[in-house]
Regions:
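Conserved acetyl-CoA-binding loop-helix of GNAT-fold acetyltransferases
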Residues: 123-139, 162-166
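Conserved GNAT acetyl-CoA-binding A-motif
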Residues: 138-160
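A short beta-loop-alpha structural element at the N-terminal edge
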Residues: 33-45
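Conserved GNAT-fold acetyl-CoA-binding loop/helix
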Residues: 46, 50-73
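Acetyl-CoA-dependent GNAT
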Residues: 65-120, 132, 198-201
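A short, internal acetyl-CoA/4′-phosphopantetheine-binding micro-motif in the GNAT/acyltransferase core
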Residues: 114-122, 150-155
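Conserved catalytic-core motifs of GNAT/GCN5-like acyltransferases
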Residues: 149-151, 165, 169-188, 200-201, ...
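Short, positively charged and aromatic/hydrophobic N-terminal segments
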Residues: 7-12
């Protein structure tokens, strides 16, 4: 899958400044690059993910995986689904990917989406840009439903707020499931929500899902940009 390496898109930051953008360094380019992840990104992506494991309930994982294990996760996702990385000034600042929602054939038109942004760069539009490109690629694959599994709580605390639920609602997701006291971390119990966004038409003669490697060349341009 070496042909994934140099494919990217450029996202222009909006001229209208937000509070988060004001926190950006004055010399930082107002340009975001989103590209397909490489296995070599594992260490940088893990550096973003690890604090979510160690200090939040956003992920139910307890132990930080090794770089080699994380590299394997990237490789596994790219065998069938998109795994995207966001960069600011050449530095990775976030990532998003899709994975199988159900391992039975009838559920193949559904995916589970995941997104993580460097914690000191939230509010800059990174997550929205990643999700936007992810959704467009999934549509090309004939995926119909994007599902997000979100840790949530009745009482917000230092480990978890319900900001992710509000964010996904803003992106067009709707609540479809709620599980009570099903996650135990930091000696506390937390809930779990499933949110869904339909991105395609459900028909009787449904076109098959196309694996991500099969569409990569179709969405690329001469300079390696993704045509989305």
């Amino acid at each position: 899958m070496t042909f994934f390496t140099d494919m990217f898109i450029i996202v222009r930051m909006k001229n209208k400044r937000t509070g988060a953008e004001d926190r950006m360094n004055q010399n930082e380019k107002k340009e975001m690059k989103i590209r397909i992840a490489k296995e070599e990104d594992a260490e940088a992506l893990l550096a973003i993910y690890a604090p979510y494991i160690e200090h939040t309930v956003i992920t139910y994982e307890y132990d930080v995986p090794t770089v080699e294990e994380f590299r394997g996760r990237i490789r596994h996702v790219l065998e069938r689904y998109p795994y995207l990385v966001a960069e600011l000034n050449g530095e990775i600042c976030g990532y998003a990917y899709a994975s199988a929602f159900h391992d039975r054939p009838a559920g193949g038109w559904n995916v589970e989406t995941s997104i993580y942004v460097e914690q000191n760069k939230k509010g800059m539009g990174i997550g929205t840009a990643l999700y936007d490109k992810l959704e467009k690629i999934l549509k090309r694959q004939n995926i119909l439903n994007m599902n997000a599994c979100i840790a949530c709580t009745e009482i917000e605390d230092e480990y978890l707020t319900n900001a992710s639920i509000r964010y996904h609602e803003h992106l067009g997701y709707r609540m479809v499931g709620w599980f009570t006291n099903c996650g135990y971390k930091f000696h506390r119990w937390y809930n779990l929500a499933w949110m869904e966004k339909e991105i395609g038409e459900h028909v009787a003669d449904q076109p098959p899902v196309i694996a991500f490697p099969e569409i990569v060349r179709d969405i690329s341009l001469q300079n390696g940009e993704l045509r989305l």
